[in-house]
From Swiss-Prot:
Subcellular location, record wording: Plastid, Chloroplast membrane
Presequence positions on this chain: 1-76
Biased composition annotated in UniProt, kind: Polar residues: 603-618
Superkingdom of the organism of origin: Eukaryota
Keyword set, alphabetical order: Acetylation, ATP-binding, Chloroplast, Membrane, Nucleotide-binding, Plastid, Transit peptide, Transmembrane, Transmembrane helix, Transport
Main location: plastid
Natural source organism: Arabidopsis thaliana
Region ranges (Disordered): 586-618
Modified residues (N-acetylalanine): 77
Membrane disposition: Multi-pass membrane protein
Family: Belongs to the ADP/ATP translocase tlc (TC 2.A.12.2) family.
Full protein name: ADP,ATP carrier protein 2, chloroplastic
InterPro entries in alphabetical order: ADP_ATP_car_bac_type
Lineage of source species: Eukaryota, Viridiplantae, Streptophyta, Embryophyta, Tracheophyta
Amino acid sequence: MEGLIQTRGILSLPAKPIGVRRLLQPSHGLKQRLFTTNLPALSLSSNGHKKFQAFQQIPLGISVSHKERSRGFICKAEAAAAGGGNVFDEGDTAAMAVSPKIFGVEVTTLKKIVPLGLMFFCILFNYTILRDTKDVLVVTAKGSSAEIIPFLKTWVNLPMAIGFMLLYTKLSNVLSKKALFYTVIVPFIVYFGAFGFVMYPLSNLIHPEALADKLLATLGPRFMGPLAIMRIWSFCLFYVMAELWGSVVVSVLFWGFANQITTVDEAKKFYPLFGLGANVALIFSGRTVKYFSNMRKNLGPGVDGWAVSLKAMMSIVVGMGLAICFLYWWVNRYVPLPTRSKKKKVKPQMGTMESLKFLVSSPYIRDLATLVVAYGISINLVEVTWKSKLKAQFPSPNEYSAFMGDFSTCTGIATFTMMLLSQYVFKKYGWGVAAKITPTVLLLTGVAFFSLILFGGPFAPLVAKLGMTPLLAAVYVGALQNIFSKSAKYSLFDPCKEMAYIPLDEDTKVKGKAAIDVVCNPLGKSGGALIQQFMILTFGSLANSTPYLGVILLGIVTAWLAAAKSLEGQFNTLMSEEELEREMERASSVKIPVVSQEDAPSGETTSQLSEKSTPTGI
């Protein structure tokens, strides 16, 4: 009886396995082997070389030819099958167990994708209600006007966003990811509930209207915007919190969590589809805003319609916020995190200033920041001009809010359609083309909107035949511009931006998202507001500065496209490196041995034996 032998290299298989197959009993056939109830599955685990290190001698009771016996051994798997035993160890079952699928998608993947889609639905439902409500609150309040918005974005929203980023960076170094998520989102839920049920009903008592009137009489009407911030400070705080909900909860909390639990392949397939549920929420939330706008109109003169509607809408916001927390808890409880390749360079914890210096020194993060800032400035240059026309066309708060509800619904429908097409764009053309579509759409539609404003006179007869005034036509064209730009942002720009974070190391990913999404997003909006303020002071009015705003828009979109092209090359390089690391890890985890040279038949080297026994007809 030959003993077990130790081998190294590549496994040498029998040159003619047919003879062995004849010796097997019917119960040892392929069908019985594959469908045996107690047969564990094959595993290519890291200890796989131990399974193949030893070769078992031929079982007693089996007659073999002299040629077969001259080999002196058969592999352990063959011997076990011939003897009716188990081929593999008991610990190998889990690795190759086939995961069940629904509609072609693994259940483990659906356990991540479905809750993430529901979370995005709830977050965007809240954001639409908050976004449509904040403008009506601050613009239609007593002693305020649309002039307050640029001052709010520049002098209130941006400082609070920077302060939040600094606090978030500190908390990210001391709190776990779960604790950080709850620590950030719970204050939003509490505030919006308190605003609807406490702060707004007491607004007449907590707003310093008498002091604001005295200061306005002393300083003059040109300071009406800054003084309005003090006059209606609780409404302005609501405005800022609504803005932060979009940048913090959507960009930092949700997308950071999604990047944490999804792989790159899952992201390419499902990130564009996350927005499907979100834009269904956009459609329904738009209808919700429209419903409450009509309800305010029908309540009668003696009832404060805003108080009634705010209580209802803030109750919905709080309920959706609690649902977000539950979904986050459920995913962390029942969904395993994907394993990622470890980065060779482990970055230590950094302070706030060190984090900012690191982010500024990274070309990758700078290009990402350029994308976010460029979008914020570009959309702001067009949107504020459009809102000034919208205010002139719909001066009533009820009409203004109702139009915004219709606008949100149309945006949801357009974005839903774009989401269906976006997966094809990513699959067919890749990340780079998808990242460049949004600036191209914004540029083309922006040119159309500004052209109608600047050259509206010649189009007046044609517009009159359509039953519209030039002002109403500008409102509708501006609405279309915003709808197409926002749908391109939600379906292509946001997924592209979030995919760009995935190949980064954990430290850059967390602090980079905080700096870009919380600071750069408001910086883009505030930058657009500063440009408009400068133009108004220089040329006397927003209308007089419109041609120059168009030129600025062209320059910013050009820089946006250049940054997208630069980021495309860096992203592809990082993805190639990460894929190479995964391949190397997989290759190093499996070691399959071969027959040692001393046991090879006389006159044959190990390499010759391996070559001779390698199957060629597979």
